[in-house]
């Protein structure tokens, strides 16, 4: 097991280039199964979750090469419609192959998914969508099987704007007969990126990024070249780190529109955020005179749940009382216990966390409970007095490419060591 050892009280200064978005790359990789042509993707981050997805695709018949951020995929035929348990148990997003498999072969069988243990995250929305398109769903011991000779377009209403369900149903519908309408669809930028990718292959999708997506089914899709959008959550993590450490960081390769709610909150707290449109970059700095905040996580375009933990690490040392309300996932305050071990004063009441700003945090031995909690503890370690050890950093490796290397480039004193 590896851990990060962090020496505190280090300002982050300099420039950092943001990687491609994991949450855009994963559904796009799954979507590559929809064509027998060659798919070439650039700006794919080198992360454990990406490698897991590539293993799933290989098991289904894809020929894959991956080097220096470029993936080339070719799946002339699907050799198996069953996603292997070994990979699926590691990562929930492997469930995204179900829509493409169903569309291309009429059958998909998959183990029940794993990944971060945050909340219920039910997959029933995906399954209801497939059923609406005409698939027959069978659930066995730890398995789900869907079969459909030919999917037929229909109207699907999502009870909750689930990102994964929107993506999976969209991919199933591109080869279905007739028109599919997804109502109360998720509006995340990663869905827009997936739709652009599919449309460039010959799909007919309109309305991605709005609450209603219309898909007209086509007979088949062609190969394509596509560049994955930048990772707004990685960008947000470095922006929050800059403010927390009273630093000055230029965050490069960002789409500012994707970061609107975070930028608004950082400015409200008293930080400075300046956009350089020509360079697709943001300058973020803070003199340390910050005000407490009220934050409520919401589906996009609201404040992202994936930045909630990092904001809490920042607010832990901001004078006054801040309130963070989590409405997207239950069980997403697991980092609070760890932050409190470092001297934070945070109490939880239902879905809200009340943060009483303390003068300083103290280095401690803590452990990442999930991906974003891990990033939050690293930020806390950079701010704290003394040395912090963050364990279970395999969680962090699932979503941040070369995290400690990028932080060292900004002046952080952080090392990866074997436990």
UniProtKB/Swiss-Prot annotation:
Active site positions, chain numbering: 116 (proton donor)
Location of 2-(S-cysteinyl)pyruvic acid O-phosphothioketal modifications: 116
A Pfam match: EPSP_synthase
Gene3D superfamilies for the chain: Enolpyruvate transferase domain
Binding site for phosphoenolpyruvate: 22-23
Gene Ontology terms, MF aspect: UDP-N-acetylglucosamine 1-carboxyvinyltransferase activity
A GO biological-process term: UDP-N-acetylgalactosamine biosynthetic process
Residues that, per the record, bind UDP-N-acetyl-alpha-D-glucosamine: 92, 121-125, 306, 328
Annotated Gene Ontology cellular component terms: cytoplasm
Pathway: Cell wall biogenesis; peptidoglycan biosynthesis
Enzyme Commission identifier(s): 2.5.1.7
Top enzyme class: transferase
InterPro entries attached to this UniProt entry: Enolpyruvate_Tfrase_dom (IPR001986), Enolpyruvate_Tfrase_sf (IPR036968), MurA_subfamily (IPR050068), RNA3'P_cycl/enolpyr_Trfase_a/b (IPR013792), UDP_GlcNAc_COvinyl_MurA (IPR005750)
Keywords from the UniProt entry: Cell cycle, Cell division, Cell shape, Cell wall biogenesis/degradation, Cytoplasm, Peptidoglycan synthesis, Pyruvate, Transferase
Catalytic activity entry: phosphoenolpyruvate + UDP-N-acetyl-alpha-D-glucosamine = UDP-N-acetyl-3-O-(1-carboxyvinyl)-alpha-D-glucosamine + phosphate
Role description: Cell wall formation. Adds enolpyruvyl to UDP-N-acetylglucosamine.
NCBIfam families: murA, PRK09369.1, PRK12830.1
Family named by the database record: Belongs to the EPSP synthase family. MurA subfamily.
PANTHER family reported in the protein's UniProt record: UDP-N-ACETYLGLUCOSAMINE 1-CARBOXYVINYLTRANSFERASE
Protein name as annotated: UDP-N-acetylglucosamine 1-carboxyvinyltransferase 2
Gene behind the chain: murA2
């Amino acid at each position: 097991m590896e851990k990060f050892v962090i020496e505190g009280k280090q300002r982050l200064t300099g420039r950092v280039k943001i990687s491609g978005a994991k949450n855009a790359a994963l559904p796009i990789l799954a979507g590559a199964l929809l064509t027998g042509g060659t798919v070439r993707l650039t700006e794919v981050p080198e992360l454990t979750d990406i490698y897991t997805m590539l293993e799933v695709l290989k098991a289904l018949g894809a020929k894959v090469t991956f080097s220096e951020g470029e993936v080339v995929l070719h799946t002339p035929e699907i050799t198996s419609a069953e996603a292997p348990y070994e990979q699926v148990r590691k990562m929930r997003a492997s469930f995204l192959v179900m829509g493409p498999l169903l569309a291309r072969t009429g059958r998909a069988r998959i183990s029940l998914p794993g990944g971060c243990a945050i909340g219920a995250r039910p997959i029933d929305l995906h399954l209801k969508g497939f059923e609406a398109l005409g698939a027959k769903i069978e659930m066995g011991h730890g398995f789900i099987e869907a079969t459909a000779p030919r999917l037929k377009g229909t109207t699907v209403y999502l009870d909750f704007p689930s990102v994964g369900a929107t993506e999976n149903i969209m991919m199933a519908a591109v080869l279905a007969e007739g028109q599919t309408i997804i109502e109360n669809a998720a509006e995340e930028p990663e869905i827009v990126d997936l739709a652009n990718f599919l449309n460039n292959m010959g799909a007919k999708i309109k309305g991605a990024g709005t609450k209603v997506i219309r898909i007209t089914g086509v007979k088949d899709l062609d190969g394509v070249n596509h560049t994955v959008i930048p990772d707004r959550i990685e960008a947000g993590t470095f922006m929050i780190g800059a403010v927390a450490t009273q630093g000055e960081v230029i965050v490069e390769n960002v789409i500012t529109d994707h970061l609107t709610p975070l930028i608004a909150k950082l400015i409200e707290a008293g930080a400075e955020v300046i956009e350089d449109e020509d360079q697709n970059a943001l300058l973020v700095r803070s003199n340390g005179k910050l005000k407490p905040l009220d934050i409520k996580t919401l589906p996009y375009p609201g404040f992202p749940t994936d930045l909630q933990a990092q904001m809490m690490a920042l607010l832990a040392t901001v004078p006054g009382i801040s309130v963070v309300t989590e409405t997207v996932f239950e069980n997403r305050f697991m980092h609070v216990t760890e932050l409190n071990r470092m001297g934070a004063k945070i109490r939880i009441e239902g879905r809200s966390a009340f943060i009483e700003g303390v003068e300083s945090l103290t280095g401690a031995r803590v452990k990442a409970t999930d991906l974003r909690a891990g990033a939050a503890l690293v930020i806390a370690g950079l701010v704290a007095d003394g040395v912090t050890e963050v364990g279970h950093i395999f969680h962090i490796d699932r979503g941040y490419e070369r995290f400690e290397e990028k932080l060292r480039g900004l002046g952080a004193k952080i090392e990866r060591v074997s436990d």
